[in-house]
């Protein structure tokens, strides 16, 4: 099976910061003190005295009464009311004071509500990113989020099961006595202000849980898991869980094995496409052996492991066993290290059980506990949806190899150059073949230049930056005289311009050994200039530094103007953002990538040492401005040139034959380039980042061109004329879950 190499990118995503909020309780109303005996009798005594005084005044005659005497009963009434008011309450707060405290406390809760609401929104966004809806998984395949969970990630071996209630990460802490809400003075609940107490209880119940939050199940916690209940719902949940695992975990860190009685069951046959179900080394006639078994013997190697430990990481990939037999995997209750068995069905012996209901909810059960609701909406995915995801993932692998078993054609060690760029003949390579790639197209700036000698695979140099899944943006090439360096550069440039429109890439070619490398390329519409060290172009060499500096400044100015034109807050961050606005319809002119190729840059730096500063600037800012640099030389020892400042930004290295092991190690980290023989012109090693060097052979395009005859395939060995070979008939095997046996070749 042919696969493309996929290098996982660790993505951080939204951040979640747990916190704690110490909730201030409502005020204490105080304890009512019962009145004393005197306080109880006093109102009656004062009432009797007032009545006696009125009786005396009436008996003595009203005419003899002074007006001031009439005020005395009124004064006594006022004194009695005041005494009653002062004697009641028993030390508690007055009503106006209680109302004021209540308003202040409700304002306090309103302020907290703003914080916890923002925290809840962040929590839902965090889990929505790391646990996207099953319908969004297909769009993640092929992006930098695919296989982005390393073994040390928090959610390594975790999968989404649905949405439901989650405890808020911003925990609400309440002061309590005996489990009840209490005031700061530890007064129990009955003595709290009742209205404020009611609101704080509602606040805790409302904001203590986050509703409709995506939920992840950490498989490493449990050795065995059973998913039962409604059969269709359980199967849909298991399908969604497996697809989530396959999209976010690379096959070298998570392996999926399947135990089933029907390997070609249409509801589960899609599993065979997952890279995680492919054996890393064993093959059959259809490619990698599928880890789909009908008997327990396929799991026998796992039984030799130690008991399951939730906190330990396996030495190899974590193994998820999908048991479709209802529990016949036969794993012991304590499980096995680095293994989780997920059984479809109500398997009572599992450590963790999920029971899916027809209404879409689900309950779960931990050991020695009863069932409780775990999701309000349980995930569900159809076999058709899963098949689309699995088939799309099948095109990727960690190594990007082509297995020998899948091909019954004679391996092509070298192919004519025009065939590699998609043409049947050189005559077909015309401007009509130029492509306008979208900015996110993986094939943009991906240049074929030869074949890997070990496998015969086509070799590409992807000069896009690493964030765009490329090997660039800057690199270095070394090769001594006769190594095929000039041939490599010509092949690289012609392959690029044969497939890419001039509006997407321009060239600035510099040759400091007389101009023979890029001879004739000044006629290409992609070429901005060809600069050599010929005497008549000496002034142009001196001006090249000014031209490149001006180009960097021009691109920065264009990004500032474009930012104002599209209404951005400031200058656009780079050409990538510029292209996004263009693809959305913004009226912006094309801003093609500038590919600067400098042959014999060591000679250039010896004559113009000030160029080292310019190259350093290109390496630093060229990434966002899309000015890509390739520095080529015969030797790093010419004139004592040192490029220490540039090396950290040179992300790909190419070494053809070198004169010493020191130069080979300086470029690709190994001495292998020194051992390339004189007869292997065009053979070299490509190293990208910290990966191992890959040996390749470039095309030979400087020889005479002969159109291929009908029915005959022309192979052009690097450094030699073409050879004619006929293609053998290919054998096609049906890709099944079960092993495909080898067939004897027919004479």
Swiss-Prot record:
It is found in: Cell inner membrane. InterPro entries: EccCa-like_Actinobacteria, FtsK/SpoIIIE/SftA, FtsK_dom, P-loop_NTPase. It is a multi-pass membrane protein. EsxB binding to the second FtsK domain of EccCb1 causes multimerization; a subsequent unknown step relieves the allosteric inhibition of linker 2 on FtsK domain 1 (this subunit), activating the ATPase activity. The keyword Cell division does not apply. Keywords: ATP-binding, Cell inner membrane, Cell membrane, Membrane, Nucleotide-binding, Transmembrane, Transmembrane helix, Transport. The active site is at 600. This is ESX-1 secretion system protein EccCa1. Residues 456-665 form the FtsK domain. Part of the ESX-1 / type VII secretion system (T7SS), which is composed of cytosolic and membrane components. The ESX-1 membrane complex is composed of EccB1, EccCa1, EccCb1, EccD1 and EccE1. Interacts with EccCb1. Residues 62-332 interact with EsxB and an artificial EsxB-EsxA heterodimer. SUPFAM superfamilies: P-loop containing nucleoside triphosphate hydrolases. The chain crosses the membrane at residues 41-61, 65-85, 222-242. In ESX-1 cluster, the FtsK/SpoIIIE-like protein is split in two genes. One of its GO terms (biological process) is symbiont-mediated evasion of host immune response. Part of the ESX-1 specialized secretion system, which delivers several virulence factors to host cells during infection, including the key virulence factors EsxA (ESAT-6) and EsxB (CFP-10). The keyword Ligase does not apply. NCBIfam families: T7SS_EccC_a. GO terms for cellular component: peptidoglycan-based cell wall; plasma membrane. The lineage of its organism: Bacteria, Bacillati, Actinomycetota, Actinomycetes, Mycobacteriales. PROSITE patterns: FTSK (PS50901).
């Amino acid at each position: 099976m042919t696969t493309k190499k996929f290098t996982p990118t660790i993505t951080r995503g939204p951040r979640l910061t747990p916190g704690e909020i110490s909730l201030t309780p409502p005020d204490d109303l105080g304890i009512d003190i019962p009145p004393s005996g005197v306080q109880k009798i006093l109102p009656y005594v004062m009432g009797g005295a007032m009545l006696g005084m009125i009786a005396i005044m009436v008996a003595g005659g009203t005419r003899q009464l002074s007006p001031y005497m009439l005020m005395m009963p009124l004064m006594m009434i006022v004194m009695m009311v005041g005494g009653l008011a002062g004697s009641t309450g028993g030390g508690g707060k007055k009503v106006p004071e209680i109302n004021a405290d209540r308003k202040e406390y409700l304002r306090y809760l309103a302020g907290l509500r703003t914080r916890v609401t923002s925290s809840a929104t962040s929590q839902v966004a965090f889990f929505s990113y790391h646990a996207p809806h099953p319908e969004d998984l297909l769009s993640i395949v092929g992006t930098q989020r695919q296989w982005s969970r390393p073994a040390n990630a928090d959610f390594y071996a975790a999968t989404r099961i649905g949405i439901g209630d989650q405890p808020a990460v911003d925990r609400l802490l309440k002061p309590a006595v005996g489990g009840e809400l209490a005031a700061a003075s530890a007064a129990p609940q009955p003595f709290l202000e009742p209205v404020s107490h009611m609101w704080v209880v509602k606040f805790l119940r409302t904001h203590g849980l986050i509703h409709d939050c995506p939920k992840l199940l950490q498989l490493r916690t449990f050795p065995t898991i059973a998913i039962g209940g409604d059969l269709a719902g359980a199967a849909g949940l298991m399908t969604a869980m497996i697809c989530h695992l396959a999209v976010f975990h690379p096959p070298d860190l998570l392996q999926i094995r399947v135990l089933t009685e029907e390997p070609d069951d249409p509801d589960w046959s899609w599993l065979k496409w997952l890279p995680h179900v492919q054996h890393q080394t064993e093959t059959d006639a259809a490619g990698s052996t599928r880890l789909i078994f009908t008997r327990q013997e396929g799991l026998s190697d796992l039984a030799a492991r130690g008991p399951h430990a939730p906190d330990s990481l396996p030495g190899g990939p974590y193994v998820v066993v999908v048991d479709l037999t209802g529990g016949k995997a036969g794993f012991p209750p304590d499980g096995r290290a680095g293994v989780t068995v997920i059984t479809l069905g109500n398997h009572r012996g599992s450590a963790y059980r999920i029971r899916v209901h027809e209404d879409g909810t689900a309950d779960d059960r931990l050991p020695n506990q009863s069932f409780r609701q775990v999701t309000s909406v349980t995930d569900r995915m159809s076999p058709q949806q899963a098949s689309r995801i699995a088939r799309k993932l099948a095109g990727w692998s960690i190594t990007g190899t082509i297995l020998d078993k899948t091909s019954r054609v004679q391996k092509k060690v070298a192919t004519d150059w025009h065939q590699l760029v998609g043409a049947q003949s050189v005559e077909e390579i015309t401007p009509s073949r130029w492509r306008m790639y979208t900015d996110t197209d993986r094939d943009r700036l991906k240049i074929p230049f030869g074949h890997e000698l070990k496998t015969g695979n086509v070799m590409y140099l992807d000069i896009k930056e690493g964030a765009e899944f490329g090997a660039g943006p800057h690199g270095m090439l070394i090769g001594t005289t006769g190594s095929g360096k000039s041939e490599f550069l010509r092949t690289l440039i012609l392959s690029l311009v044969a497939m890419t429109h001039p509006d997407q890439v321009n060239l600035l070619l510099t040759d400091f050994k007389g101009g023979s490398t890029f001879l004739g390329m000044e006629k290409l519409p992609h070429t901005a200039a060809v600069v050599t060290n010929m005497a008549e172009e000496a002034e142009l060499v001196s001006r090249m530094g000014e031209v490149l500096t001006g180009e960097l400044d021009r691109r920065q100015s264009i990004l500032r103007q474009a930012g104002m034109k599209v209404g951005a807050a400031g200058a656009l961050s780079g050409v990538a953002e510029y292209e996004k606005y263009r693809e959305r319809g913004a009226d912006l002119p094309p801003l093609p990538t500038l590919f600067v190729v400098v042959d014999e840059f060591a000679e250039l730096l010896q004559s113009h040492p000030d160029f080292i500063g310019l190259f350093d600037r290109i390496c630093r800012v060229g990434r966002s401005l899309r000015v890509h640099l390739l520095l080529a030389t015969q030797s790093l020892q010419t004139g004592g040139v040192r490029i220490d400042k540039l090396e950290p930004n040179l992300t790909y290295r190419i070494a053809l034959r070198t004169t010493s092991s020191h130069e080979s190690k300086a470029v690709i980290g190994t001495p292998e380039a020194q051992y390339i023989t004189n007869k292997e012109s065009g053979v070299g090693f490509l190293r990208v980042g910290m990966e191992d060097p890959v040996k390749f052979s470039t095309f030979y395009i400087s020889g005479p061109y002969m159109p291929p005859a009908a029915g005959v395939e022309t192979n052009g060995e690097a450094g030699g004329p073409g050879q004619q070979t006929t293609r053998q008939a290919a054998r096609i095997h049906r890709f099944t879950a079960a092993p495909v046996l080898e067939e004897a070749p027919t004479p």
